[in-house]
A protein has these predicted regions:
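Conserved phosphate- and dinucleotide-binding cores of soluble alpha/beta proteins
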Residues: 2, 6-22, 26, 78-249, ...
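N-terminal active-site beta-alpha-beta segment that forms phosphate/nucleotide-binding
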Residues: 3-85
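A generic structural motif
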Residues: 61-68, 248-258
Length: 258
């Protein structure tokens, strides 16, 4: 059976979150190991699905953010912190505390991160607006040296048609001459990238082909997908899409740039 569905960016985030919470490796680490959910707007949805609790200001579950005004930094007041789930117990931490937790983690544990870009070569790019590289700057050494499983939650709206390594070589806070907002560098990382395509596959076992994108009247950034699979699986996928239709768009509060 074939079905066409359209997902807005917010609906895509919800789908991705449901899939990550459904992954056996995440379920196992949540109960028997450690899961770190780093701040990002997509990860606000992930945290809701993992904990079964609403995050009222999902647009504040991030430090750096892209808005209609460009690359911005969220206000410190009301900004979400990274969340750690250790054997079912939940706590929040800030960047300086991550190292003490990460150094004890290993392959059976999970670090979930959002991204600003993904490329066709399995790489994810994270914009760095602060000296030292923020969250990923503090975490990446531990993730790679300890073999911690990294899951990258990113909708196909983040897909760019280049090798991100080429972008990194051109970028840097001290390289950019002019910026209308926050100057950025970039770090390229690897891991299990979960887009809407992987999410549908994880949840329903259907094949997914993106067949279009964009829209107006609230569908800006939307993606159109063709779902292909057994009748019951496709019907279940479509039924789930109906439940997330109308997922509200996110808003945030940012620091006024000079």
């Amino acid at each position: 059976m074939l079905a066409e569905v359209v997902l807005t960016p917010s609906e895509g985030k919800r789908l991705i979150a449901k899939a990550i919470a459904h992954m056996p490796i995440v379920k196992l680490a949540k109960e028997n190991g450690t899961v770190i959910v780093a701040t990002s707007t997509t990860n606000a949805y992930v945290l809701e699905e993992l904990l079964g609790k609403e995050i009222k200001e999902k647009g504040m579950f991030t430090a750096g953010v892209v808005t209609k005004d460009g690359l911005q930094i969220t206000e410190a007041k009301g900004r979400g912190d990274h969340t750690v789930i250790q054997k079912g117990k939940v706590k929040t931490v800030k960047v300086p505390e991550l190292g003490d937790i990460l150094k004890e983690m290993g392959p059976g544990d999970i670090f979930i991160k959002g991204a600003n870009a993904i490329d066709p070569f399995g790489q994810a790019g994270i914009l760095l607006g602060g000296i030292g590289g923020g969250t990923i700057g503090a975490a990446w050494g531990y993730l790679t040296s300890n073999g911690i499983t990294t899951i990258i939650a990113a909708g196909l709206e983040k897909l760019v048609p280049i090798n991100l390594t080429d972008a990194v070589n051109r970028m840097g806070i001290m390289k950019v001459d002019i910026a209308l907002d926050v100057k950025c560098g970039m770090m390229v990382i690897g891991g299990y990238i979960i887009t809407e395509m992987e999410a549908f596959k994880e949840l329903f076992g259907v094949d997914v082909v993106p067949i279009g994108g964009g829209g107006i009247d609230g569908a800006e950034g939307a993606k159109i997908f063709l779902l292909d699979g057994e009748d019951e699986a496709v019907k279940e996928a479509v039924a789930m899409v109906k439940t997330i239709r109308g997922e509200p768009k996110l808003t945030t509060r940012t620091i006024k740039q000079k």
